[in-house]
Swiss-Prot record:
EC number: 3.1.1.2, 3.1.1.81, 3.1.8.1
Organism of origin: Rattus norvegicus (Rat)
Taxonomic lineage from the root: Eukaryota, Metazoa, Chordata, Craniata, Vertebrata
UniProt remark on cofactor binding: Binds 2 calcium ions per subunit.
Protein name: Serum paraoxonase/lactonase 3
Residues given in the record as Ca(2+) 2 binding sites: 54, 116, 168
Regions crossing the membrane: none
């Protein structure tokens, strides 16, 4: 009887694993054909060669870019170089990327920046918040931006026991922000198992000096996060579920679900067009090529625009798509006055005029 029970349990476990493997294969399918779509006047940005995972543009047109991310399972073209924060002034006729110096006292060799977000205080001081993975840990670094000379002053490192596998961040007040956890586990083996079994254990966190709490959960892999222009709604990308969750923000910072927009492609970082309120999504049309990188058959890039996301019928259109011949592994797109920057996990960055 004991052997029969053991065999039954083993058989059920293998059947479940087989079903989950098929589901995983479907979620990271490489079967999609990419129809090239490119605005006029696009060119690669000189100096950004090792990723540009996230981009945040100030109302003034200054764009902050996080580069050099080393992420488990992803390629890296400069594994021994620390990450950097770059700046571009999109008001210039020919914007160039400038690496920002960081004040003494911060271990720049440990900088491994992921998602970033800016906050402008009442006195117009600009603060940059960056998810950092020093030694594959997760922290949030707070910097003050200095206009003259353009540089960053490190103010604070935020750590918390809930800050595991943090991906992206959106800041809504002084030391008040939402952050996403893209995995529940942190060890490579358990992360792989989590990706296959897909238990939907990832979440959105809220942080303030007074409290840290989980405000939304049940995502396959919570990734990019941003807010509507009126800051009443929070947009969360569930990357492996291929959708965007729209959530209502309450006075106590809790989030409640409103709707889900299905996109049929893996959704990474999100930004909002300041002129229209449209969502821009950096996407991965063939993610298996990210996991198994072949420079002869690289992963493609895709940027989607979601118009009227709060309406009953949001309109989804493609702003940019490429099979990897120009841009590989797009993660983010951000716009300012008809100028668009597209970033990637480990590859280059693109400047386009819309």
């Amino acid at each position: 009887m004991g052997k029969l029970v053991a065999l039954t349990v083993l058989g059920a476990s293998l059947a479940l694993l087989g079903e989950r493997l098929l589901n995983f294969r479907e979620r990271v399918s490489t079967s999609r054909e990419i129809k090239p779509t490119e605005p006029q006047n696009c060119h690669l940005i000189e100096g950004l060669e090792n990723g540009s995972e996230d981009i945040d543009i100030l109302p003034s047109g200054l764009a902050f870019i996080s580069t050099g991310l080393k992420y488990p399972g992803m390629p890296s073209f400069a594994p021994d170089k620390p990450g950097r924060i770059f700046l571009m002034d999109l008001n210039e006729p020919y914007p160039k990327a400038q690496a920002l110096e960081i004040s003494d006292g911060f271990d720049q060799d440990s900088l491994n920046p992921h998602g970033i977000s800016t906050f402008i205080d009442k006195d117009n001081t600009v603060y940059l918040y960056a998810v950092n993975h020093p030694h594959m840990d997760s922290t949030v670094e707070i910097f003050k931006f200095e206009e003259q000379p353009r540089s960053l002053v490190h103010l604070k490192t935020i750590k918390h026991e809930l800050f595991e596998s943090v991906n992206d961040i959106v800041v809504l007040g002084p030391e008040q922000f939402y952050a996403t956890r893209d995995h529940y586990f942190t060890s490579h083996f358990l992360v792989l198992l989590e990706m296959i079994l897909d238990p939907h254990w990832t979440s959105v966190l809220f942080y303030s000096p007074k409290e840290v709490k989980v405000v939304a959960q049940g995502f396959s892999s919570a990734n990019g996060i941003t807010v509507s222009l009126d800051q009443k709604y929070v947009y969360v990308a569930d990357v492996t579920a291929k959708n965007i969750h729209i959530m209502k923000k309450h006075n106590n910072w809790d989030l409640t679900p409103v709707k889900v927009i299905q996109l049929g492609t893996l959704v990474d970082n999100l930004t909002v067009d300041p002129a229209t309120g449209d969502i821009l999504a950096g996407c991965h049309p063939n993610p298996m090529k990210l996991l198994i990188y072949n420079p002869e058959d690289p992963p493609g890039s895709e940027v989607l625009r979601i118009q009227d996301p709060l309406s009953d019928n949001p309109r989804v259109s493609t702003l940019y798509s490429n099979n990897g011949s120009v841009l590989q592994g797009s993660t983010v797109a951000s716009v300012y006055h008809k100028k668009m920057l597209i970033g990637t996990i480990f590859h280059k960055a693109l400047y386009c005029e819309l």
